[in-house]
Amino acid sequence: MSLSRSLPGALCAALALVFAPGAFAAPPTVAEVIERSGATDWRPLVLADTLVMELADPRSGPIVIELAPRFAPHHVANIRTLAHEGFFDGLAVVRVQDNYVAQWGDPDAESADKARSLGTAQRKLPAEFSVPLKDLPLTRLPDTDGWAPVSGFVDGMPVAADPRRGQAWLTHCYGMVGAGRDMAVDSSNGSELYAVIGQAPRGLDLNITLVGRVLQGIQALASLPRGTAEMGFYSQPDQRSGIRRVRLLADMPDAERPAIEVMRTDTATWRALLDARRVRREEWFVHSPRHINVCNATVPVRVKKNSG
């Protein structure tokens, strides 16, 4: 057989092999990226930077909050002191505004006679709305963000940035925790906190100090009855949900610490997860948005796997 006559058949056979089902592995789905992740794609909780809040109702379960010392070092240090000294124990959730925030602290904070002492915590702190962008280990999203020129993740936290100003800041995504303030920008000290329980109110960015995010248990806050007074505050004391206690992981016995870990946001696995969310490949999807934003690219949290 001549070479010229054998080429078409050989070429067809080669093409059939190349384009055969399974010749190339399909890009993974979100679930597959998480399932295939390795131990180094996850990180443990930092004991001094994690709070566990328990509501008075034991059915609510623990609310685990990871603090963000890189972005709000003064507030985080103060919150550590408040939690260590038991400031939040016995206080209450004082406000639940639908599609907005759940807020907790001292119901008598405005009363000079009844307000709970802050102990050794600072009463006055500087506003911590943003930090220098330079040298920040930001994993950027290529997707357009309507609120900032740049967005991405640092230490598992959603971040926006403006390279022209050289500043970066945490964003008000679902589950983010902030320090309530009055009119003065430096009137927050971490004794009054809130968590976002609705659509991301990004207009609050750069107006309030964000201190971390809820890793586990946000449903306990999001499912509380809504306050009926102005801005979702409770009009009667008996409407409030009590707080049993708030502790740092560092102050808890090993056996009581939540055994969870967080996916790192500086790895190839994290970037693969972002791509899988951007281009949905699950069979159910008939349309893929080919876009994500910093507030719907949620960082996974899972029960810690045994090393053995």
Region annotations inferred by a language model:
Residues F24-G308:
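Cyclophilin-like peptidyl-prolyl cis-trans isomerases
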Residues M1-L11:
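Bacterial N-terminal signal peptides that target proteins for export
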Residues A20-P21:
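N-terminal signal peptide c-region/cleavage motif recognized by signal peptidases
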